[in-house]
C-alpha cells in the first residue's frame, strides 16, 4: 500500500513539474522522451579542413562511406555563403572528407541552426545506398515547399533565402 501511495505521489509531482517548462526533462527521466537528435553519437574522426561538396550520389567517390545522416535546420535570411560556411564547419568538425547534399525544403519553424543526426547505426558505402534519404522522414514530410539549392546558389553571397530551410545531408569519409 505504501509503495502505491509513493508511486501516485511521484506521478503527481512529475505531472506538476512537467507543466513548468521541464516537460522534456521529465519525459526523458521517466523514459518517455526520445533521443536528442542534436547530439552527434556516431564515429569520431579527426577534424578536416578540405571538404568536397556533391549534389548527386554519382559525384561521390566509390570508396566514400556514410558516417552521418542529418537533416540540417537553417534559420531564415541566410545567404548561400552562410549555408556553405555553417555546413562545412560542422562537417569539418565531424571529420568529413565529402558532403552529399540532398533536397531542400522551406522549414515550417525557425529553430535556428541545428543539425539533427539520425544515424546510421553502421557506416555504409555511398555507392551502395546513397540517395534513398529515408532518415527523418516524419519531420521531412511536415515541411513546406521545395527550394532549389544547388551549385548556382551554393556559396553565393548574392543569393538569400528569406524562409527557414530544412536540408538533407550525409557526411562521408573517403580515406
Predicted features and spans:
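Sec-dependent bacterial lipoprotein signal peptides
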Residues: 1-20
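Bacterial Sec signal peptide processing site at the extreme N-terminus
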Residues: 14-39
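Compositionally biased P/S/T/G-rich terminal and signal peptide-adjacent segments
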Residues: 31-71
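C-terminal partner/receptor-binding element of secreted or periplasmic proteins
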Residues: 45-49, 148-175
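Soluble periplasmic/extracytoplasmic beta-strand elements of cell-envelope proteins
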Residues: 52-54, 66-73, 98-102, 168-170
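Short, well-ordered alpha-helical segments
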Residues: 70-112
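Mixed-charge, low-complexity intrinsically disordered segments
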Residues: 107-161
Amino acid at each position: 500500500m505504501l509503495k502505491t501511495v509513493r508511486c501516485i505521489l511521484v506521478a503527481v509531482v512529475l505531472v506538476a513539474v512537467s507543466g513548468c517548462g521541464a516537460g522534456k526533462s521529465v519525459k526523458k527521466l521517466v523514459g518517455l522522451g526520445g533521443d536528442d537528435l542534436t547530439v552527434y553519437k556516431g564515429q569520431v574522426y579527426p577534424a578536416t579542413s578540405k571538404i568536397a561538396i556533391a549534389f548527386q550520389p554519382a559525384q561521390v567517390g566509390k570508396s566514400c562511406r556514410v558516417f552521418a545522416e542529418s537533416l540540417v535546420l537553417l534559420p531564415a535570411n541566410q545567404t548561400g555563403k552562410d549555408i556553405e560556411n555553417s555546413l562545412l564547419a560542422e562537417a569539418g568538425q565531424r571529420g568529413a572528407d565529402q558532403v552529399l547534399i540532398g533536397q531542400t525544403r522551406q522549414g515550417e519553424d525557425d529553430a535556428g541552426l541545428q543539425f539533427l543526426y539520425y544515424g546510421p547505426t553502421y557506416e555504409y558505402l555511398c555507392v551502395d545506398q546513397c540517395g534513398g534519404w529515408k532518415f527523418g522522414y516524419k519531420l521531412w514530410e511536415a515541411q513546406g515547399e521545395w527550394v532549389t539549392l544547388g551549385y548556382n546558389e551554393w556559396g553565393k553571397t548574392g543569393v538569400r533565402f528569406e524562409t527557414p530551410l530544412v536540408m538533407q545531408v550525409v557526411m562521408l569519409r573517403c580515406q
